[in-house]
Amino acid sequence: MKKYWFNSMLSNKKLEQKCGLSKSMDGLDALGHTSGSEETIRKDADKKIPSWDSYSFSNIHYLNSLFDRRNLWSLISDHTFLVRNSNGDTYSVYFDIENQIFDIDNASSFLSELPSYLKSGSNNSNYYYSYYSMYDTQSNWNNHINSCIDSYLRFEISLNSDIYSDIDSYISSFICTESTSSIENCTESTSSIENGNSSIKTSSSYFNRIEKSNDFDLNTKYKQLWVQCENCYGLNYKKFFSSKMNICEYCGYHLKMSSSDRIELFIDPGTWEPMDEDMVSIDPIEFHSIDPIEFHSEEEPYIDRISFYQTKTGLTEAVQTGVGQLNSIPIAIGVMDFQFMGGSMGSVVGEKITRLIEYATNRSLPVIIVCASGGARMQEGALSLMQMAKISSASYDYQSNKKLFFVSILTSPTTGGVTASFGMLGDIIIAEPNAYIAFAGKRVIEQTLKKTVPDGLQVAEYLFHKGLFDPIVPRNPLKGVLNELFQLHGFLPLNQD
């Protein structure tokens, strides 16, 4: 068992700063300075020091402890120390960290070793540091020893208080800016150990909720570079995302594609000829003009919304129609775009699809319609519902009378009036993996029937086993599958003899 003398001393400012220690020493003398403090210890040496069980802590004692950092690792084993408190009382402290043993006893047996220790003590304060704490329980002593070891380790790897302060201030400035008003519940947890004028504080900030803001948005700078997967939340590099057909490189999830990207996927380069591009909606029922006093809608007018999405997507409506070639096979194709008002079907969408089918009927072309829609457009009322019957009528003539080939491709989401009409009228109905396909959405069903809809009930894989459509085809082989289907039904490439 080794014996150590704990005396109070002043460490240099650099070391105090690195360890985050208080500079107040309560007027105690430094190690090796025997004018007063050594005499006080010797005078108080004869005082009776009770054991831990009988020692009274009603009067708070602040123990000024020193460790030689060269010998700090030896504290792991059992040792006995001579300790002097702020009142000048001396007593021996025995503790064993491994066995969690702690005891205080009379210090008289150590006094004979005091002069030799003071003479041999080092005058270099760089090897020492001072730690001030208030202890009133035995468990606090154990915490104190552990904190001393932790402080030593932080000092050894140069993680000083300046670095912590810089990191904290950087994080705070990065997340909690003065101009950001969208951060809520930003609380700071501060733990402190105080003794009079000195204290040690450790602060850490917890952010329970961070909302998006125009002044502060983590994605503002880099949102043009990455696309986040809806399934695994992985980041896909946007530059190569289109070449991968908007399929997540981590989990293989099929993300939404724009109508232009789908046309590029299906149609041979240089063969695309759009139809009815100049056809736009004109708010046929004047949706926001009825009873303006009683109608308290916070939404912008329908015409303004149309203009907004036209600017955002570069499209005139929620569907692109036209003719082109798929592996040199002439086809008529209509592709819905969910980015334009959720792909909702209004009078213009219905008219463009109807004209496409009629054109294919007259030219005996196969038809592909790619569905991505939330259903009928409510801003056009009954006119949007009429499109279901109009498209179905044109499809009947195309399929039943002319015996031509219609392929419907269901992507995520395909719901409402599109599902109830031409979406399910194809001779071959193809679905994409994990596509959300339904007539009424989950929320509508639960609110109407007051029943819980299980997760996955309206996903393509589940519906496939119920016979709702034909194959589930990923995007990679989809063009080849369509090519084989067309040739199987007698539609051959133009350049084939």
UniProtKB/Swiss-Prot annotation:
The lineage's top-level taxon is Eukaryota
What GO molecular-function term can you cite, just one? zinc ion binding
Tell me which InterPro entries the record gives.
AcCoA_carboxyl_beta (IPR034733), Acetyl_CoA_COase_Trfase_b_su (IPR000438), ClpP/crotonase-like_dom_sf (IPR029045), COA_CT_N (IPR011762)
List, in alphabetical order, the GO biological process terms annotated in this UniProt record. Answer: fatty acid biosynthetic process; malonyl-CoA biosynthetic process
| Reactions that this protein is recorded to catalyse | N(6)-carboxybiotinyl-L-lysyl-[protein] + acetyl-CoA = N(6)-biotinyl-L-lysyl-[protein] + malonyl-CoA
| Localisation per UniProt entry | Plastid, Chloroplast stroma
Q: Which GO terms describe its cellular component?
A: acetyl-CoA carboxylase complex; chloroplast stroma
Q: In which pathway does it act?
A: Lipid metabolism; malonyl-CoA biosynthesis; malonyl-CoA from acetyl-CoA: step 1/1
Q: Which UniProt keywords apply?
A: ATP-binding, Chloroplast, Fatty acid biosynthesis, Fatty acid metabolism, Lipid biosynthesis, Lipid metabolism, Metal-binding, Nucleotide-binding, Plastid, Transferase, Zinc, Zinc-finger
Its family remark reads: Belongs to the AccD/PCCB family.
* Protein purpose: Component of the acetyl coenzyme A carboxylase (ACC) complex. Biotin carboxylase (BC) catalyzes the carboxylation of biotin on its carrier protein (BCCP) and then the CO(2) group is transferred by the transcarboxylase to acetyl-CoA to form malonyl-CoA.
Could you identify this protein by its name?
Acetyl-coenzyme A carboxylase carboxyl transferase subunit beta, chloroplastic
Species of origin reads Phalaenopsis aphrodite subsp. formosana
Taxon lineage: Eukaryota, Viridiplantae, Streptophyta, Embryophyta, Tracheophyta
